[in-house]
């Protein structure tokens, strides 16, 4: 099995106003739906079953993914990877515009980033690496599955987009054309993971040891 996940909750409403969460994480939720629609229409079906899940409570402490990890519909011992989608719609980042590319959290922890990147080339999508990418590994729902030994990573377009957890995270700022293109690249990577004879593997990076040795 493969998991493809995204959280659909956000911060809600406060005295300051409504936090719409269009990019974080409406965009990730839409990406899960669209990738599921595209891959679900393929004939023949992929070699491995792909399970698409939208999760609640990420902003409250990864609650939805924590629950699924403890009550899986399909055995985690038979789950080879989780690809978690976050902030797929905005390209504006203080480090420069992130059009036509995405990054993967914890890239040194497994060979998943290289698999996704190689497959995404067919859609003219690149993968960029942040120096602090490993530091973001435990910041989203992938972390719940990694604690059970499932290779899990979060895919992000613009990590530090303006309006993060702000009132200005509105749909008008989403780059829909780029989002569709990146989704196609990510879908190509997911399909490769689903069809490859070899499952992805944890690396020997020191930071991966705790997950590599986690009990299933």
Language model regions located:
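Soluble non-cytosolic domains of exported or imported proteins
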Residues: 22-30, 44, 59-63, 106-111, ...
């Amino acid at each position: 099995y493969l998991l493809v996940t995204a959280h659909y909750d956000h911060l809600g409403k406060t005295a300051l106003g409504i936090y719409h969460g269009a990019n974080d994480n409406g965009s990730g939720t839409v990406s899960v739906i669209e990738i599921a629609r595209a891959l679900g229409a393929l004939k023949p079906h992929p070699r491995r079953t792909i399970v698409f899940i939208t999760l609640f409570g990420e902003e409250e402490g990864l609650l939805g993914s924590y629950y699924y990890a403890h009550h899986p519909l399909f055995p985690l011992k038979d789950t080879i990877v989780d690809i978690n989608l976050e902030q797929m719609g905005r390209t504006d980042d203080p480090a420069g515009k992130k059009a036509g590319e995405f990054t993967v959290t914890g890239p040194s922890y497994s060979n998943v980033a290289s698999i996704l990147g190689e497959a995404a080339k067919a859609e003219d999508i690149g993968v960029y690496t942040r120096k602090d990418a490993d530091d973001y590994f435990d910041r989203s729902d992938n972390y719940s599955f990694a604690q059970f030994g499932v290779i899990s990573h979060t895919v992000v377009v613009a990590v530090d987009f303006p309006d993060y957890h702000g009132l200005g995270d509105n749909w008008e700022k989403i780059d829909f054309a780029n989002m569709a293109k990146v989704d196609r690249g990510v879908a190509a990577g997911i399909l490769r993971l689903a069809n490859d004879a070899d499952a992805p593997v944890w690396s020997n990076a020191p930071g991966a040891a705790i997950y590599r040795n986690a009990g299933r």
